[in-house]
């Protein structure tokens, strides 16, 4: 019986891990934009930690390079996120000839706790002796992240694309970032805002 319970717990944990996902919830493209694919982008990540910011920006730069786009991490210009003022970013964008600025922000982190009630099953062969077998209840902790990403043209600052993404129980920061980058680059390419992959 103990081995069955342990196996059941392991299965629950495995299924929970399998359900962890990052999804593109919604996206909007400015119909007034007619500038074609953007080929040089400054990448700005506004996350919970400086390490997360740099990791996202560098991963996005690598993914853009694979698509034939010059993507540059803002961390190289502004090590401290507090330096990311409108005026400072605009000056760098104009000076270095960027066509776009991609700003991705961690908007919220929501943590919930769900109590799964015990499951009761008839214990065949022991009915009337032990009564019923009880599978103990357990607590499930969920973490949901909401992320937004906006692409602006430079130097005008026109919004050409905005997306909302969610991630439920990401297994690690690295995997979360990889999923975010893949979803964003795929959608931007599909919409013609980035050039098709060579």
Whereabouts are the PLM-identified features?
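Structural motif marking the loop-to-transmembrane transition
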Residues: 3-4, 94, 173
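C-terminal/domain-edge helix-coil "capping" segments
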Residues: 19-40, 48, 135-198
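Surface-exposed short loop/turn segments
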Residues: 84-151, 155
């Amino acid at each position: 019986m103990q081995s069955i319970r342990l196996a059941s717990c392991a299965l629950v944990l495995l299924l929970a891990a399998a359900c962890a996902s990052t999804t593109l919830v919604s996206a909007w493209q400015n119909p007034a934009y007619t500038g074609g694919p953007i080929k040089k982008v400054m990448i700005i990540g506004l996350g919970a930690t400086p390490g997360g910011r740099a990791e996202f920006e560098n991963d996005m730069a690598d993914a853009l390079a694979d698509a034939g786009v010059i993507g540059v991490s803002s961390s190289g210009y502004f090590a401290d996120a507090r330096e990311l003022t409108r005026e400072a970013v605009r000056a760098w964008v104009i000076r270095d000839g960027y066509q776009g600025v991609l700003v991705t922000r961690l908007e919220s982190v929501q943590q919930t706790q769900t109590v799964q009630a015990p499951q009761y099953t008839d214990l065949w062969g022991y009915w009337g002796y032990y009564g019923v077998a009880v599978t103990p209840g357990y607590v499930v902790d969920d973490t949901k992240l909401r992320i937004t990403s906006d692409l602006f043209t430079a130097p005008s600052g026109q919004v050409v694309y905005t997306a909302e993404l969610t991630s439920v129980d990401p297994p690690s920061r690295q995997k979360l970032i990889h999923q975010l980058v893949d979803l964003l680059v795929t959608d931007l390419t599909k919409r013609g805002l980035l050039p098709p992959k060579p």
